[in-house]
Amino acid sequence: MKRTFQPSVLKRNRSHGFRARMANKNGRQVLARRRAKGRSRLTVSK
Protein backbone atom coordinates (compact mmCIF):
# COMPACT_ATOMS: atom_id res chain seq x y z
CA MET A 1 0.00 0.00 0.00
CA LYS A 2 1.26 3.46 -0.91
CA ARG A 3 1.74 5.81 2.02
CA THR A 4 -0.07 9.15 2.05
CA PHE A 5 2.97 11.34 2.78
CA GLN A 6 5.28 11.53 -0.25
CA PRO A 7 7.68 14.36 0.67
CA SER A 8 8.68 17.01 -1.88
CA VAL A 9 10.63 20.12 -0.83
CA LEU A 10 9.32 22.11 -3.81
CA LYS A 11 5.63 21.41 -3.10
CA ARG A 12 6.24 22.02 0.62
CA ASN A 13 7.74 25.46 -0.02
CA ARG A 14 5.16 26.44 -2.63
CA SER A 15 2.28 25.78 -0.25
CA HIS A 16 3.82 26.59 3.15
CA GLY A 17 6.92 28.67 2.37
CA PHE A 18 7.62 32.29 3.31
CA ARG A 19 6.73 33.73 -0.09
CA ALA A 20 3.50 31.71 -0.16
CA ARG A 21 2.57 33.17 3.25
CA MET A 22 3.41 36.72 2.14
CA ALA A 23 1.33 36.34 -1.02
CA ASN A 24 -2.00 37.01 0.71
CA LYS A 25 -3.41 38.79 3.74
CA ASN A 26 -4.24 35.66 5.76
CA GLY A 27 -0.74 34.30 5.23
CA ARG A 28 0.70 37.55 6.59
CA GLN A 29 -1.57 37.16 9.62
CA VAL A 30 -0.09 33.67 10.16
CA LEU A 31 3.42 35.17 10.16
CA ALA A 32 2.34 37.96 12.52
CA ARG A 33 0.87 35.41 14.97
CA ARG A 34 4.04 33.31 14.86
CA ARG A 35 6.23 36.41 15.42
CA ALA A 36 4.04 37.45 18.38
CA LYS A 37 4.32 33.97 19.85
CA GLY A 38 8.10 34.11 19.47
CA ARG A 39 8.60 31.24 17.04
CA SER A 40 12.21 30.89 15.92
CA ARG A 41 11.05 29.42 12.58
CA LEU A 42 8.19 31.34 10.98
CA THR A 43 7.83 29.03 7.98
CA VAL A 44 9.11 25.65 6.77
CA SER A 45 11.43 27.34 4.26
CA LYS A 46 14.85 28.75 5.35
UniProtKB/Swiss-Prot annotation:
**Gene Ontology BP terms:** translation
Q: Where is the composition biased (Basic residues)?
A: 31-40
Q: Where is this region: Disordered?
A: 1-46
A GO cellular component annotation here is: ribonucleoprotein complex
Q: Which NCBIfam families match?
A: rpmH_bact (TIGR01030)
HAMAP family found in the cross-reference section: Ribosomal_bL34
> What is the protein name stated in its UniProt record?
Large ribosomal subunit protein bL34
From what organism does this protein derive? Erwinia tasmaniensis (strain DSM 17950 / CFBP 7177 / CIP 109463 / NCPPB 4357 / Et1/99)
Tell me the organism's taxonomic lineage: Bacteria, Pseudomonadati, Pseudomonadota, Gammaproteobacteria, Enterobacterales
